[in-house]
């Protein structure tokens, strides 16, 4: 069965910047390893993107500091993640296998239209599995997992808990429990 890997918001502001924490930094090597070892045809990664003055008028903007400002440093992928994606592409080229990665830019927690569309582009034939990693477990990972659960009711979805981090360890665990309750498979949970 074919599989697609979705890497959620592994951007500088979420990992080592304004919204980062010890847990988000700690998962970077695991996420890089997962990307480099991905032996399937497609990886998608989301990019949270905000701009003023619009952001400050949103509910998120009223509660969360401005982050991932489009085309500023914090918007871009963490350097190690970007390098892992390039290694994935190079390895696929060396093996003469198809392999690609692409971005999905989103302005809110869940990429409601964009992510299902891009998955269908990458995986036009069913059945397939969706595998997810990234940050923040309790915000964008869960939001996108639930979007995909609704968009693809017959597809198995897996979230690798060891490659996710939340705003707090408690929120991470709570989000995993909610995803389990919504028929999302949680793997590598400690």
Named regions from a protein language model:
Residues 149:
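Gly/Ala-rich phosphate-binding loop of Rossmann-like dinucleotide-binding domains
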Residues 103-143, 165-190:
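Conserved N-terminal glycine/acidic-rich loop preference
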């Amino acid at each position: 069965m074919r599989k697609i890997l979705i890497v959620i918001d592994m951007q500088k502001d979420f990992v080592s910047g304004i919204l980062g924490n010890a847990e988000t930094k700690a998962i970077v090597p695991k996420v890089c390893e997962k990307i480099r070892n991905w032996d399937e045809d497609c990886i998608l990664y989301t990019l949270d993107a905000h701009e003023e003055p619009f952001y400050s008028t949103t509910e998120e903007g009223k509660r969360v500091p401005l982050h991932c400002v489009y085309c500023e440093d914090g918007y871009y992928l963490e350097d190690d993640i970007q390098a892992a994606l390039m290694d994935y592409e190079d390895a696929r080229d060396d093996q003469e296998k198809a392999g690609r990665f692409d971005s999905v830019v989103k302005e809110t927690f869940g990429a409601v239209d964009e992510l299902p569309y891009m998955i269908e582009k990458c995986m036009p034939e069913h059945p397939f599995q969706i595998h997810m990693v990234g940050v923040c477990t309790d915000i964008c990972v869960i939001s996108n997992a639930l979007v995909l659960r609704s968009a693809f009711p017959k597809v198995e979805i897996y979230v690798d808990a060891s490659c996710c981090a939340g705003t707090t360890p408690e929120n991470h665990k709570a989000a995993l429990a909610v995803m389990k309750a919504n028929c999302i498979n949680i793997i590598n949970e400690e």
